[in-house]
Regions:
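Active-site-adjacent structural elements in enzyme catalytic cores
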Residues: 1-353
Length: 353
């Protein structure tokens, strides 16, 4: 299969319309299209077509019990696929949609088990990226979409990342430039009387509690070991995710001790002949001694850290780093989501000083 890469960001209205029309036709025919959202690039198919959803799992090499998120362009579409929409869910959708929040509700029978990983619930999101909503609208379908990377790898934040993983596996990639947020949406389970965060993201617990009386966090989110014998109620809960090809290790503790430890580890691995990368911050990068150094952003601006994370992990892959070391981040607000992704990317390799 030949994979076409179509730019829809800086083109004429006619060229954009033609690209979206082509993408919509592929979806209606049961095919796959990669498209930009405000979080990461998604790999989309007709959510109500079980055969189309199965193609997503095949293209990614994704376990079939790992549910997909259904992307919509209009809030009224929720009522087509959810058997009930609690008042609390309506408040959350009104406040945070369109945006980087996925809401889990009990599903109607029209949603195939192949889309939900065999669950009786459905994960729904209305993205804020205008190109994503234009694509969904043009397709005339609701779009099931995980991140557009091969399973387990760092999520794509550029169309070139998608092409690297999906070339020859899908017919079309819509190139909308760099995404804004850089990590996947927050997922909140509202299928029961209790509202529970199953995956942290840009929308934080504190933000959700501005409209909900209480929000719980699933223990799997804050855990520091991989839980294997669990039901994956949401994407990212059960399997290794976001991982570079080399071994990433996080180091946490007092700043000066962390820097000293990372420099010690780098020296040890470089003397063994390995290629080593270090992830620092704007505030600490000059303190490290390694051939390959990258600043992930500023601790004062955690949104920059989130936006750069997957890009840097992919850069280290391109540079064929055997080992990577990174500072850890304070687990509060957006830092919860950052550490959740980094721990999974590291396979929970963490040194605490």
């Amino acid at each position: 299969m030949e994979t076409e890469l179509l730019n829809i960001e800086k083109v004429s209205p006619e060229e954009k319309a033609a690209a979206l029309k082509k993408a919509g036709e592929i979806i209606r025919e049961g095919g796959l299209v990669a498209f930009p959202t405000e979080t990461v690039y998604g790999l989309g198919a007709d959510a109500l077509n079980a055969e189309a959803s199965a193609k997503i799992y095949a293209a990614k090499g994704r376990p079939s019990d790992n549910p997909l998120i259904v992307h919509i362009h209009d809030v009224d579409q929720v009522y087509e696929i959810a058997s009930e929409v609690p008042e609390a869910a309506k408040k959350v959708m009104e406040k945070f949609w369109p945006g980087p929040l996925t809401v889990i509700l009990n599903k109607k029978s029209c949603v195939p088990d192949g889309t939900t990983g065999g669950l009786k619930t459905v994960a729904i999101r209305m993205p804020s990226h205008p190109l994503a909503r234009d694509f969904i609208r043009e397709s005339g379908r609701m779009i099931a979409a995980p991140s557009a990377n091969t399973s387990g790898r760092p999520s794509p934040t550029l169309a070139s990342h998608v092409y690297e993983d999906m070339q020859g596996r899908i017919p079309l990639i819509l190139d909308g430039g760099a995404v804004g947020i850089g990590i996947e949406s927050t997922i909140i389970d509202m299928s029961t009387d209790t509202s529970t965060i199953l995956r942290p993201g840009y929308i934080t617990k504190d933000m959700l509690e501005e409209v909900l009386p209480k929000v719980n966090i699933d223990p799997a989110v804050t855990g520091r070991t991989m839980k294997k014998n669990v039901v994956a109620k949401a994407p990212g809960m059960k399997y290794r995710h976001y991982a570079p090809k080399g071994q990433l290790t996080l180091v946490e503790g007092d700043r000066d001790k962390v820097i000293a430890k990372i420099n010690e580890l780098v020296k040890e691995k470089e003397e063994e002949g390995h290629k080593v990368g270090v992830i620092g911050t704007d505030e600490t990068l000059d303190s490290y001694h390694a051939d390959i150094l990258r600043s992930i952003g500023s601790r004062q601006k955690p949104e920059t850290v989130a936006a750069n994370l997957y890009r840097i992990l992919r850069e280290f892959d391109d540079l064929e780093c055997d080992y990577m070391y990174s500072e850890s981040f304070f687990e509060q607000g957006l830092g919860n989501a950052i550490m959740n992704r980094m721990l999974k990317a590291a396979g929970y390799h963490l040194i605490t000083l």
